[in-house]
């Protein structure tokens, strides 16, 4: 590999989240290959984290960042987390993780995500603090308390009209309903369409999905607009998604402002001090 790659400050090596999402029977996807629409060859997704760790072990950046869905911390998936910790330790890093939510980080979207931060062991000494009775870790402040931004502060409420099959339920909504599924259960006494969530004016936008028809406005019979999808994900309105629909692109990514907040904390708490020491 090129020499400059062996002198990285941060390696962001996040891995695909679909196999760790709590939506659906995720265990069925473990150990199986998947083809992406972007054109990559068929590959397993549940072990890509370990290829990322192998890359970190080779390049030895100062800091390694992984991001994934909160489902990674639940159920049988926790075994992956244990293995990630073990392999990162072997790669020469002290690893920590936090469950963060974009809504507290200047992003107008409810998007909980797990962030793993690893600091190279030879750089840790000045930052070490006692985490608990048994563990010492490099200190970093990962508390975020930005004011929440509700839907009505930015929405144009101008998405694609919902179809008649959805409209017949939407017309019977009440303030307590959080999804079309709540109405289906009340009217038809069956479980369906709970993934079709309502967006309410005075609430933070729900998690953006890779599919347009997962979110619809409570006060307007339409799905979330491209305009709102882009702004709720903190992309510029003129961003080039390279032919992808904004719902898919935004649903598959970390909001840039969320990532910028994490990077700023890494700089403030670790890298700025390391750089200062290197220049002394």
What would you call each of these model-derived segments?
Residues 2-8, 18-198:
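Class I S-adenosyl-L-methionine
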Residues 11-14, 52, 64, 116, ...:
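Conserved small-residue
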Residues 14, 103, 119, 209-211, ...:
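Structured loops at beta-to-helix junctions and adjacent beta-edge loops in soluble globular domains
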Residues 15-16, 61, 108, 236, ...:
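Proline-centered helix-kink/hinge sites
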Residues 159-280:
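C-terminal target-recognition/interaction regions appended to catalytic cores
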């Amino acid at each position: 590999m090129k020499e400059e790659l062996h002198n990285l400050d941060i390696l962001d090596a996040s891995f695909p989240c679909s196999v760790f999402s709590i939506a659906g029977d995720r265990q069925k996807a473990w150990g199986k290959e998947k083809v992406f629409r972007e054109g990559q060859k068929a590959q397993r997704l549940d072990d890509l984290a370990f290829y990322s760790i192998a890359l970190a072990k080779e390049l030895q950046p100062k800091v390694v960042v992984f991001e994934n869905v909160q489902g990674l911390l639940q159920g049988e998936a926790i075994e992956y987390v244990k293995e990630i910790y073990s392999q990162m330790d072997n790669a020469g890093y002290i690893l920590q993780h936090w469950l963060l939510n974009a809504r507290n980080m200047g992003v107008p979207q409810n998007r909980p995500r797990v962030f793993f931060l690893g600091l190279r062991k030879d750089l840790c000494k000045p930052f070490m603090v006692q985490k608990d009775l048994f563990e010492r870790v490099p200190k970093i402040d990962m508390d975020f308390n930005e004011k929440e931004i509700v839907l009505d502060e930015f929405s144009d409420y101008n998405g694609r009209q919902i179809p008649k099959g959805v409209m017949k339920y939407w017309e019977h909504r009440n303030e307590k309903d959080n999804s079309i599924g709540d109405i289906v259960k009340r009217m038809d006494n069956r479980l369906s369409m709970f993934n079709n969530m309502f967006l309410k004016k005075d609430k933070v936008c729900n998690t953006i999905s890779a599919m347009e028809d997962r979110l619809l406005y409570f006060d307007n019979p339409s799905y979330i607009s491209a305009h709102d999808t882009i702004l709720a994900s903190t992309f510029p309105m003129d961003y080039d998604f390279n032919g992808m629909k904004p719902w898919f692109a935004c649903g598959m990514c970390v909001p840039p402002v969320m990532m910028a907040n994490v990077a700023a904390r890494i700089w403030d708490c670790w890298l700025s001090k390391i750089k200062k020491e290197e220049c002394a």
